Regions:
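N-terminal helix-turn-helix DNA-binding core of bacterial DNA-binding proteins
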Residues: 11-49
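N-terminal intrinsically disordered/low-complexity leader segments
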Residues: 1-8
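C-terminal regulatory/oligomerization modules of transcriptional regulators
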Residues: 94, 98-127
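Canonical helix-turn-helix DNA-binding module
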Residues: 39, 43-71
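Short aromatic/hydrophobic contact patches that present stacked aromatics
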Residues: 45, 79-81, 115
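Extended, folded domain segments that form the structural surfaces/walls around functional sites
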Residues: 29, 37-42, 57, 92, ...
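Basic, amphipathic "hinge/linker" alpha-helix immediately C-terminal to the N-terminal HTH DNA-binding motif
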Residues: 21, 72-95
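Generic leucine side-chain signal with a strong bias for well-ordered alpha-helical environments
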Residues: 17-20, 26-27, 53, 57-60, ...
């Protein structure tokens, strides 16, 4: 099977990976959850080429995880905001980060600490 065909299979995992399985996509989504919205913010944070970033953002917009919202008319400039579909990926990213903290830390420093907005207590994502 070719990678282009993965999204056409009857497997939910494969269809999800067709959208999210690229090496930059989850990092772009992570940055969205951290409050980034603008192209230049993503590029400065990730160090990805403009062409690759534009492609990944377009794919996320096309898939429905992000929406492109104008914030300046001349020259035209856009922000990328999470949609309901995109927001639903938050627990997935938290679980992936938790897995990485547990299995891949290798003494590189303290993991990110998550704080519940409503009560202010620290928490660890669990499944």
């Amino acid at each position: 099977m070719k990678w282009q065909e993965v999204g056409e299979t009857p497997c939910s995992m494969a269809r999800s990976l067709a959208i999210l399985g690229d090496r930059w996509t989850l990092l772009i989504l992570r940055n969205c959850f951290l409050g980034m919205r603008r192209f230049d913010e993503f590029q400065a944070s990730l160090g990805v080429t403009r062409q690759v970033l534009a492609d990944r953002l377009s794919r996320l917009v096309e898939a429905g995880a992000l929406k492109k919202v104008p914030y300046q008319e001349r020259p035209p400039r856009y922000e990328y905001r999470l949609t309901e579909m995109g927001h639903d990926l938050h627990p997935v990213l938290l679980a992936l980060a938790n897995w990485g903290d547990r299995w891949l830390d290798e003494g590189r420093g303290a993991p990110v600490e998550y704080v519940h907005k409503a009560c202010g207590h620290k928490f660890r994502p669990t499944m």
